[in-house]
A protein has these predicted regions:
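A generic structural signal for short beta-strands and their flanking turns/coil linkers
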Residues: 7, 31-33, 47, 53, ...
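A small-molecule sensor/coupling module
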Residues: 88-129
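A short beta-strand-loop-beta hairpin characteristic of the jelly-roll/cupin
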Residues: 35-48
């Protein structure tokens, strides 16, 4: 039987798991503790996500081979992470449809949350919606794109 776990590691609060812009060859499942993901633009750090036990992160770089979109760090002392490398990830996606569906569901959930935040921020700034935002709303309301 194939071993799915590259390794389990424990992190201290504030310890960097991966840095924004670095290549991604693994994803992580939070066994215990918490992780935060941030991005830094023009010297300003912005919180993208805070996650806890049972959640996963780092999968985007495995799916699209792009560099990491944010910096992940432990948000609690004793945060334990299970690391899956690219080979194990691809094996699970191919052999375990439920795993692939979980990844897709979570990605869709995250996209919808970001879309909602974008539209909320756009409304607060008094700006007009872009055509892409109009299409997103139409799609969510069952309209044709």
């Amino acid at each position: 039987m194939k071993s799915f776990v590259k390794f389990i590691r424990t992190y201290r609060k504030g310890e960097i798991i991966f840095a924004e812009g670095s290549p991604g060859q693994e994803m992580y499942v939070i066994s215990s503790g918490a992780v935060k993901v941030t991005t830094t633009k023009s010297g300003k750090e912005t919180l993208l996500a805070r996650m806890g036990t049972g959640e996963f992160f780092g999968e985007m770089s495995l799916v699209d081979a792009a560099p990491r979109s944010g910096t992940a760090s432990a948000d609690e002392d004793g945060t334990r992470l299970v690391e899956l490398d690219l080979d194990r990830f691809l094996y699970l996606v191919q052999q375990q449809p439920a795993f692939a569906l979980t990844i897709m569901h979570t990605l869709c959930e995250r996209i919808r949350k970001r879309d909602a935040l974008y539209l909320e921020l756009l409304g607060k700034s008094g700006g007009e919606q872009s055509p892409a935002a109009d299409e997103t709303q139409a799609g969510e309301q069952g309209g044709a794109l």
